[in-house]
Amino acid sequence: DVTGVQTCALPIFCDNYETVNARAALDDPNSVFYTYQSLIRLRKTLSVLTWGDYEDLLPDHPSLWCYRRQWQGQTLMVVANLSHARQQWQPVPVEGAWRVALSNYEEVPFRPDTLLLRPFEAIWWVQE
């Protein structure tokens, strides 16, 4: 009996189970699975991802999660669109040399800059 249960939690009840599944994620190098693998690898090489001061840059925004971390001379800035819609982002002013440490989309700005984030886009920039 599945009364009151969100039936899509059970694959046999999901309309898209043949295309959205673990096998499809493993076959797609741009899937969430591989993005998380890259993030785990990055965490092992960038201490600022784990340690340091955390500053929430947009604490009240309903769709964007933006923060900055600083640790031992490194600065990390992360912006993530948590919605299905494009979202405008205006960063705090930044100086110096930045590089994209990780992104789940191709063709992203090489430094934090005003941009229109695509659905579920996330970018990690680092300044050393």
Predicted regions and their residues:
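Surface-exposed beta-strand/loop patches in extracellular or lumenal glycoproteins
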Residues: 82-95
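Residues that act as N-cap/strand-start positions at coil-to-secondary-structure junctions
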Residues: 61-63, 83, 109-111
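Hydrophobic, well-ordered secondary-structure elements that form the walls
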Residues: 39, 79-81, 120
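Single conserved hydrophobic/aromatic residue that forms the stacking wall/gate
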Residues: 1-8
